[in-house]
């Protein structure tokens, strides 16, 4: 079972004085203005100009005399009529377009009498366009004609209005009178005035200049401030203002300090405005109802099933017990203000229905206690209230219970378990955090003070940006101002997802102000160089995830828009290219799995190389650094080949030595490349110690010799010495150092595995000396091929002869 919205009859109007006249006016004229007194005992009806008498009727419930006023044909009727709020005795204020204001009240004697008559515009040349009464003040918007003495300059038609107010003061037996005049706003466009119990809303009308018709102002007298709000932009700004101390605002000066509010926007297409306890309700021509809150924020309340046909159609809005009520013609729709869900829709028997504000808090009335706060409807059939009725015996669950019940059904539909989930299990199981978080939010775990503390930094940044925009509009220190603005904007964009319009804006800032944009990025990523020349970052992973996100596979960004990482590499390559390789290397360390686009994505070093230009046109030194720092085998081998081609032997050797033990295959490939160069020429001999260090320890001597033999030049001569001017050949002495490196771990035990290992492990002891006595010469024919033995020290040693391997 659910609660049902009901219409309860409070009165058939027979207990009001002049009931017949009251029913006649309510049934006859749909454009009649209806107001209710704060105590709920008086009903006021004002008919539009040109209507038959009486044009004004005040009916009283219970004892009392009604008030009827009529004005002769040709005389203007009042522009508006108000009950004076927050006073014990009922009082009325009538305001004419000419500026005439009359105060009527009920004194000790029965009946209504005129208490005061005054001119709101005593200097003449002005007319009242809108008027409202709020919290002991009468506020009006008057149109000032050009040429008035107190105006310093000729005003344009668009800004020829000003907003003024008079205080309502009690005066003994006289009851109420209007006090002194104060000016709230100079040189403003035409505004409509709508008063709630605490604030005054200055809203645009159909005649407001289109350039500012998307703005509205909120004046909070108790707080002494004016709030400028732009609902379509989602912006609001507060300014301190205390008219009692002589404070006033020039509307044009006010807008100059808020350049962000002047973005071209369509005027607010509002059909109906209505005050509420939470702010100002507005209904647009599409049927959407929004709430402008007292702090300037705007949120959508709901969308009606039936939208207004035109501006001429009647509509009324009101709220009660967290419910929005809208009367559109003869249809009443009730919506939940928290969710926007349609609760109920009723068809009324008449289309001439007026919504009345609830009685003021603390006012005594004769209605039942359960109707307090309910919405009241007035028609010729009577006075009704709209309220919710809960069936007896039904206990409504709390919001927290409803969350766990709904979550229980949600998880049960998606669960693979056979057991049944219960709300109690969700309450105490820490695995299901979403319903617990939502329940804590509904429970109000964050008071306004805590929320304000959380948002204070964001609000401070927003305020500083608005001040900076005003400084730029004024033309003060433009270069520094634009730099600071770019830094703020880059910092803001890095907190977004950096897609779509945000990414395009990010590119635009880097193109216009690259130095300032990179400085802001430096702060956002918290980049700092260490003593070894490397970059370090303390930025959270979420920031790096946004920066390193790769473009979607198969989709190129239009108009040259680069992804964040490519844009940063391009900017860094132009400003400080020496820091590009360390930045890319740091980015490789920060990158996590799944941070690229869907599908395979390019390595970061290749993405950085792509923005430096086409292959062959890139800065060679920068390309080498990126290839060597990538850690990718193909990239490192490509860099080593380029170094060998440039004959930068030491750098090529250091690139191989820089590899740790986790890359033995890559290190071995680099050694083979350099060993091939070592076998072909002698330009690498000066770096033989580094080549020996690079030699893998697992390479056997015979493998080393086979590698050398593979790369030996084929055009060597047969003579032991090189010809004059020719490059010396590879010698055993040079090879010996490499052979020793292959056995650095100690001579293996067991049988000799290689023909050359006995040479490598020869301890250096010479063979026994032959006897010194004369020996008989053996005929050469007995020992063919055997040469005479040469004593040690007489002849050439093996190391001194150029032996061709």
From Swiss-Prot:
GO cellular component, one term: early endosome
Keywords recorded for this protein, A-Z: Cytoplasm, Disease variant, Endoplasmic reticulum, Endosome, Lysosome, Membrane, Microsome
Organs and tissues of expression: Widely expressed, with lowest expression in skeletal muscle.
Ranges of Pro residues composition bias in the record: 764-773
Residue segments, region Disordered: 743-805
Organism superkingdom: Eukaryota
Membrane listed as a keyword: yes
Disulfide bond entries: none
Subcellular location as annotated: Microsome membrane; Cytoplasm, Cytosol; Early endosome membrane; Lysosome membrane
The keyword Zinc is annotated on this UniProt entry: no
UniProt cross-references to InterPro entries, sorted A to Z: BLOC-2_complex_Hps6_subunit, HPS6_C, HPS6_N
UniProt main location, coarse: membrane
GO BP: blood coagulation; intracellular transport; lipid homeostasis; lipid metabolic process; lysosome localization; melanosome assembly; pigmentation; platelet dense granule organization
UniProt disease annotation: Defects in Hps6 are the cause of Hermansky-Pudlak-like syndrome, a syndrome characterized by hypopigmented eyes and coat, melanosomes greatly reduced in number and morphologically bizarre, kidney proximal tubules secreting lysosomal enzymes into urine at greatly reduced rates, platelet dense granules deficient in critical components, such as serotonin and adenine nucleotides, leading to functionally abnormal platelets and prolonged bleeding times, and mast cell granules undergoing unregulated 'kiss-and-run' fusion at the plasma membrane.
Subunit structure comment from the entry: Component of the biogenesis of lysosome-related organelles complex-2 (or BLOC2) composed of HPS3, HPS5 and HPS6. Interacts with HPS5 and HPS3. Interacts with biogenesis of lysosome-related organelles complex-1 (BLOC1). Interacts with dynein intermediate chain. Interacts with AP-3 complex. Interacts with DCTN1.
Job description of the protein: May regulate the synthesis and function of lysosomes and of highly specialized organelles, such as melanosomes and platelet dense granules. Acts as a cargo adapter for the dynein-dynactin motor complex to mediate the transport of lysosomes from the cell periphery to the perinuclear region. Facilitates retrograde lysosomal trafficking by linking the motor complex to lysosomes, and perinuclear positioning of lysosomes is crucial for the delivery of endocytic cargos to lysosomes, for lysosome maturation and functioning.
Name of the protein this chain belongs to: BLOC-2 complex member HPS6
Organism: Mus musculus
